[in-house]
A protein has these predicted regions:
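Residues at the C-termini of beta-strands that transition into short coil/loop
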Residues: 36, 83, 105, 161, ...
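General small-molecule cofactor/ligand-binding pocket signal
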Residues: 33, 102, 188
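A short, well-structured juxtamembrane/interface segment
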Residues: 24-50, 62-63, 68
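Non-catalytic C-terminal accessory region of glycerolipid acyltransferases
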Residues: 2-21, 25-30, 42, 92, ...
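Catalytic core of membrane glycerolipid acyltransferases/transacylases, capturing the structured
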Residues: 49-108
Length: 252
């Protein structure tokens, strides 16, 4: 990573402080409902087995919230963060929560990132959070790299999702979700998926598609708790105001 200037360091410190307050405010005010499917993790947590938590990039805010909850129950949680200066803000925020940071980029240093993830899983029992459609999309498309990591390590993939009763959505590639304060939040845990070490290309593609389907089904289960209205339904989205083209409002 390039040497940070004093100005850049100050921006990171201030940005981390502000972001931490905003996230904490959302975590504190939103009403998280009893987690659906949490029994799927009981055996894994009891035996302190490393696993690979997977949720779509758009769901980072309460995906991170749930990983913090699992961390308090003994899971050795980790996040892959870009080694660039842009990733420093996220790194500082995660460090402030006591979450392990693995520096690497799936797009720029893919092989090195895979090696780093393999090492922390096998050596330290880390559960590295994975956004299988990140960092740039396409949205909700499960990339094969996550399947390869599960093959190499033997760690199961665990699908996770949440849905917010009321939320804003950024008009970014992933339609990033910002739950509104005091909204109800449904979190769903899917069944762990174990991946065979030896797969043909066709078999690997079948597993990739099955994982993508499982992740989408997990999200649909979370959304179905709100009168079967999907968070991604464009009919339920409207501009926050007439001048704002960067964020949509989703209300159930």
């Amino acid at each position: 990573m390039a040497q940070l200037t004093i100005k850049k360091k100050l921006k990171i410190v201030l940005g981390t402080f502000v972001l931490k307050i905003v996230v904490r405010l959302l975590w504190a005010t939103c009403r998280v409902q009893p987690v659906i499917g949490e029994e799927h993790l009981q055996h894994i947590l009891t035996n302190k087995t490393a696993f690979i938590p997977c949720f779509w990039h758009e769901l980072l805010i309460f995906g991170a919230y749930y990983m913090r909850r699992l961390q308090k129950r003994g899971a050795n949680v980790g996040f892959l963060v870009s080694p660039s200066s842009d990733g420093e803000l996220g790194s500082q925020l995660l460090n402030s929560w006591g979450i392990q940071v693995i520096r690497g980029s799936a797009t720029r240093t893919g092989a090195q990132a895979m090696q780093a993830l393999y090492t922390v899983i096998k050596k330290d029992g880390v559960c590295p959070v994975n956004n299988p459609d990140g960092p740039r999309g396409p949205a909700r498309e499960f990339k094969v790299g996550t399947i390869l990591l599960a093959q190499l390590t033997g760690a199961p993939l665990v699908p996770l999702a949440y849905a917010a009763e009321k939320a804003w959505r950024f008009r970014s590639w992933d339609k990033f979700v910002i739950p509104k304060p005091f909204s109800r939040i449904n979190i769903v845990v899917g069944r762990p998926m174990y991946v065979d070490k030896k797969l043909s290309k066709d078999e690997q593609e079948a597993v990739r598609y099955a994982a993508q389907t499982a992740l989408n089904e997990t999200l649909r289960t979370a959304e179905s708790r709100f009168n079967n209205l999907q968070l991604s339904n464009a009919q339920n989205e409207r501009p926050l105001d007439g001048k704002n083209n960067n964020c949509d409002d989703t209300t159930r």
